[in-house]
Amino acid sequence: MAYSGAQKALKSDKLDEAQALAKSCAGRPDFLPCDGLSICATHSHGKCFKLHWCCYLGWCHCKYVYQPMTNVAQLPSTPVPAAPSDCPDTIDLSISLTERFLRISPCFQAPPCPESPKYCNIAELFIDDYIVKRINGKMCYVQRPQAHVEPAQMNPIQKQHTEDKQIVEETVKGPKMGHCSSPSTSEDSGINALGGHFLESCEEESEEEDELSTDGHSSPGSLWDQDECTLLSPSKSMVEIIENIETTV
């Protein structure tokens, strides 16, 4: 009994609150009465923006609405011109930018031309010009011989014969090389590889000659065995022993 009485008192309090709220809402100028379930069915707070008495809920919606929506007719509008103006409705952006660029292009200046790079040969960085040669299996620094000016009118066969003859003459006339030393300790800042028989080489060379004699390319003894001749000229032995290597230092 007491519980039912309390429920009735609670309902009456809610009804009184709803009626008082409806009266306060009805006094506002934007209050609209309920026009049916079509509006009251959308009583969600996120969709129902009109201030009206909702017959579905039993009280006024103005409690849950913060601001009424402005009527579309009252919104500020831009007057539409009656006659079309000279300006087109659309514009080609690429053409417009191109025209603007052509107008202001004379203001631009070309960047300064960079200086041309200066090249130099690596050989110019060294005081002396050396090449590496293998003499009796030893790698030694040898001063590069100066290039000789050759006649322009010469057949290839005669040219090759002249070069071979010149190499043989230089090897015969050149001094004998006593040992392999560094370029800094020699008199001409390099070892003169165009020496004599080259049978007198480095002191530590005897053991290496024995090891290199097995391949038949590095030692003079192997060359003598291959040629089957009793006597070999010094110039020929020098040409066979010295091997030019393309590496430059």
Curated annotation (Swiss-Prot):
One Pfam family matching this protein: UPF0524
The protein, known as: UPF0524 protein C3orf70 homolog B
Biased composition (Acidic residues): 201-213
PANTHER family linked: UPF0524 PROTEIN C3ORF70
Record lineage: Eukaryota, Metazoa, Chordata, Craniata, Vertebrata
BP terms from Gene Ontology: circadian behavior; nervous system development
Family of this protein: Belongs to the UPF0524 family.
Domain of life: Eukaryota
Keywords for the protein's UniProt record, in alphabetical order: Neurogenesis
Segments of this protein annotated with the region Disordered: 174-230
Disruption phenotype: Double knockout of c3orf70a and c3orf70b resulted in significantly decreased expression of the mature neuron markers elavl3 and eno2 and the midbrain/hindbrain marker irx3b. Neurobehaviors related to circadian rhythm and altered light-dark conditions were significantly impaired.
Function as written in the Swiss-Prot or TrEMBL entry: Plays a role in neuronal and neurobehavioral development. Required for normal expression of the postmitotic and mature neuron markers elavl3 and eno2 and neurobehaviors related to circadian rhythm and altered light-dark conditions.
